Amino acid sequence: MGKKAVCIISGGMDSALSAKIAQEEGYEIIALHFNYGQRTRNKELECFRKITQELNASESYEIDLDFFEQIGASALTDKSIDVPIGGLEEGVPVTYVPFRNGIFLSIAAAIAEKHGAEALFIGVVEEDSSGYPDCRESYIEQMQKAINLGTKDETNIEIKMPLVSLRKSQIVQKAIELGVPLEDTWSCYQAEDAACGVCDSCRLRLRGFEVAGVKDPIAYRK
């Protein structure tokens, strides 16, 4: 039997590349997507399905986590909080979803244990990102310890973060090199028809393409 990896795929560029790297490393892909009440859930799900098909994933999970809307406290899940469009600022932005990656990784670990998967792949980026605390490498390493303490003795899961120290321009270049369908990825926090171009995530993406010297294949409003 070949080795298996659960890949958390949001539909964005980073997670699509992370999953492609897992495939390149010889893992059988178990694709995992979360609908957590985010503003662009429909577009993200559409992109996830296209990416999963391109990866020829052996299994695909679409998990609904409606409780994130009940918790709120994030511009991504609470429509009473505006998505910032003024550029990146210091500190943790209002687009941070409380403990999202911790919850995602816990569910991914349960699926990995079910399938006997050796690895979880997550496309967190620490250096060139929005500054979310649950994207830090040190945090993910501690989650790996907790997961392996809280699962069966024979379960040994490694959480892989292949992009954690890359800049967005390097992610763009690597994605093109590996043939990731960037036209089927979505980064915008607030629009589903054409990307807004002004939220933090759009700015980071556009800057990455600009520095890489490549045109972004998706449509933008401005």
Curated annotation (Swiss-Prot):
Q: Name one GO biological process term.
A: queuosine biosynthetic process
Q: GO molecular function: any one? A: ATP binding
Function summary = Catalyzes the ATP-dependent conversion of 7-carboxy-7-deazaguanine (CDG) to 7-cyano-7-deazaguanine (preQ(0)).
Its EC number is: 6.3.4.20
UniProt keyword terms in alphabetical order: ATP-binding, Ligase, Metal-binding, Nucleotide-binding, Queuosine biosynthesis, Zinc
Q: Which organism is it from?
A: Sulfurovum sp. (strain NBC37-1)
Q: Which cofactor does it need?
A: Zn(2+)
Query: Binding of ATP: at which residues?
Result: I9, S10, G11, G12, M13, D14, S15, A16, L17, S18, A19
* Catalytic activity field: 7-carboxy-7-deazaguanine + NH4(+) + ATP = 7-cyano-7-deazaguanine + ADP + phosphate + H2O + H(+)
How and how many cofactors are bound, per the record note? Binds 1 zinc ion per subunit.
One Pfam family matching this protein: QueC
Known pathway? Purine metabolism; 7-cyano-7-deazaguanine biosynthesis
NCBIfam families assigned to the protein according to its UniProt record, in alphabetical order: 7-cyano-7-deazaguanine synthase QueC
| InterPro entries given in the database record | QueC, Rossmann-like_a/b/a_fold
Name the family: Belongs to the QueC family.
Q: Which residues bind Zn(2+)?
A: C188, C196, C199, C202
The name on file for this protein is 7-cyano-7-deazaguanine synthase
Q: Which gene encodes it?
A: queC
Checking Gene3D superfamilies in the record gives: HUPs (3.40.50.620)
